[in-house]
Amino acid sequence: LAYTCEVKHVYGLSNDGSLSISGFEKQMRGSSFSVSRLSGEIIGEVIPTLKAKSTSVVNKGSARNSFKAIADFGNQFQILEVKEYLKKPVKPFVSSSMGGAGIVTGLCR
C-alpha cells in the first residue's frame, strides 16, 4: 500500500513572513515519489526519508481524516499530509521540511 505523488509547487518562507515560490521549484516540479502507507517511508527524487533516523504514520487516513506521516532526521523533521478523506482517486498533498526543501505541494494517487 503506497501513494505515488507528483510535485506541483515548492514554496519557501520569505523574510516578510509570507510564502513565495522557492528556487527549488524549477528542478523539483514534476518530480515524483512514493510513500508507504504502512511506515511513512518516502522513496523518490524529492523529500526522501532514506537518511531519516525514523519514520512513522501519525494517522492512516480514513473517510474523515488525512493520512499523516513524520520523519525524524535528528536535527530536523519532515511532515507529510495527504487528503485521504476526499472521495476521488487523485488527492492533494502538502509536505513541510524544516531545513530542507520547504513546503512542497502536489497530487497523489
What are these regions (language model features)?
Residues S18-S22, Q78-P92:
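Extended Gly/Ser/Thr-rich low-complexity repeat segments
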Residues L38-Q78:
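Contiguous, well-ordered beta-strand patches that form the walls/edges
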Residues K88-I103:
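Short, exposed beta-strand-loop hairpins at the edges of beta-sheets
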Residues V10-G12, G44-K53, S97-A101:
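Short, solvent-exposed aromatic-acidic interface loops
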Residues M28-R29, G74-E81, G100-V104:
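Short, surface-exposed coil-to-beta transition loops
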Residues T4-E45:
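Short, solvent-exposed loop/hinge segments that bridge or flank secondary-structure elements
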